[in-house]
Amino acid sequence: VDDLIATGSSLIEAVQALKKAKAKSIRAAISHGVLSGPALERLDKCKDLEELLITDSIALDNHKKHPRIKVLSIAELLGEAIKRIHNEESVSSLFD
C-alpha cells in the first residue's frame, strides 16, 4: 500500500523484497496512479506483481492501461464527502 506510483521504482523494490522473503502472492494498492516515465515498462517486466490496484483520482490515458492494473472508482466516496461537508456533517466516519 502506498500513496502514489510515479516511475514505479519503489514498488518494484518492494515486490523484489517480498519475493526474496518468499511471498506466495504479491499485489499492490496505490491511491494515485501517476505512472510517469518508465512505470509501465517496469510493471511489464515485473512478473511477480500479480495485480496493481489504483484509484481513479488521476485519470488513466488509454496508453497507460495495463492488464494487471485494476482501477477502482472513488466517485461515490468523494460525492459523499462533499455532501457531508456541505451539510456540516462528519467525514471521519467515512473511514471507520
Language-model regions, residue ranges each:
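PRPP-associated nucleotide enzymes
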Residues: 1-96
